[in-house]
Amino acid sequence: MSAENQEELLDYSDSEEIAVPTTTQAGEGESANDKEADKKGSYVGIHATGFRDFLLKPELLRAIGDCGFEHPSEVQQVCIPQSILGTDVLCQAKSGLGKTAVFVLSTLQQLDPVAGEISTLVICHTRELAYQIRNEYARFSKYMPDVKTEVFYGGTPVKRDIEKLKNKDTCPHIVVATPGRLHALVQEKAIRLNNVKSFVIDECDKVLESLDMRRDVQDIFRATPHQKQVMMFSATLSQDIRPVCKKFMQNPLEIYVDDEAKLTLHGLQQYYIKLEEKEKNRKLSDLLDSLEFNQVIIFVKSTQRANELNKLLCACNFPSIAVHSGLPQEERIERYKSFKEFNKRICVSTDVFGRGIDIERINLAINYDLPNEADQYLHRVGRAGRFGTKGLGISFVSTKEDEEVLEKIQSRFDVKITEFPEEGVDPSTYMNT
């Protein structure tokens, strides 16, 4: 992080010493601090074989069954038993392991809805992710008719949000929001957070690495009660950002499922193609013609390139859709929904789609433009191969800078990315049968 981001952070008390939390790799034996962990109710050794083992509310189990989920993922096995007890949680786990379900199920399990009182606050950095999290709450609370969830983000009329919050009948129990809009509502005294029991940040590294966003979050945090549960999740948590996250917590349970060198995704085939910039369009067309895929997401580095490439694909009879931050908010959401509902199979996007967005049919991710950072590569290709399914990631390498990023990716994630074979790849290696 840059020096300017090393701002003094909100803490509970200068004199309060934060005890060393239990930290472990999921699935490993007890750490050296096992005695201390026992005192706090360590999660070590708790491995549920089904969601019923978590003793969740019948309404939640019924909704989980409707979704077709039988067995919790590794991160869910580790997190849920402690998070439903109100323990603070800092969790890093690779894309596609169901981190969202951890905090959605945990907060719904603990929720006792009271009219006009906001009990759960979830903060995320993009509007699309906020929309998706709201939908997850709707999915898992379908048999809890008294529970109301609302999403608040910029680009929509703030008066509409204020009206919903003023009325006891429409005031939600669960708020999912982006930091800017939520901060504005707090400043206007339009939202009452004095009853918040759960404070969640998804993709917390992205939210807290920006100084402006972090200041907003600190102000929001101060408006909530001192005693509450704090949970933070991300696929990437650098050593620099972890202490920043823990400043908001009290004795958190720290869970790092796989260390930093092993954050690669199960079932994902990864390749690169060396070519000149002017050759990209022809190669992309060839790939879309020759590869089998359900849905594909193509990442570019700017909104202008997204629009241009989208026009080109449509002109070449590849019906695509573009999603990027340059679109009006309502249009962005409509396009996101259209792609998610399988109305289009090809999406051209900037990094607005690169984090947390979960569309289960995507099994091909193409980096038309490589990202500048290795971590962003993980979030991008993680759109394919979600929840342990197969997928294919292909990256175009056209400059010296691209070659350097590719080297960083392979070093950072301890993975060998090979050149895409001339004869192509067997669909069975990346398509689920």
UniProtKB/Swiss-Prot annotation:
Annotated Helicase ATP-binding domain ranges read 80-255
Known catalytic reactions:
ATP + H2O = ADP + phosphate + H(+)
Q: Which UniProt keywords apply?
A: ATP-binding, Helicase, Hydrolase, mRNA processing, mRNA splicing, mRNA transport, Nucleotide-binding, Nucleus, RNA-binding, Spliceosome, Transport
Q: What class of enzyme is it?
A: hydrolase
- Biased composition (Acidic residues) is annotated at 1-17
Give residue numbers for sequence motif Q motif.
49-77
EC number in record: 3.6.4.13
User: Which annotated residues bind ATP?
Assistant: A93, K94, S95, G96, L97, G98, K99, T100
Supply the domain comment.
The Q motif is unique to and characteristic of the DEAD box family of RNA helicases and controls ATP binding and hydrolysis.
Protein name, as recorded:
ATP-dependent RNA helicase SUB2
| Source organism per UniProt | Lodderomyces elongisporus (strain ATCC 11503 / CBS 2605 / JCM 1781 / NBRC 1676 / NRRL YB-4239) (Yeast)
Its lineage opens with:
Eukaryota, Fungi, Dikarya, Ascomycota, Saccharomycotina
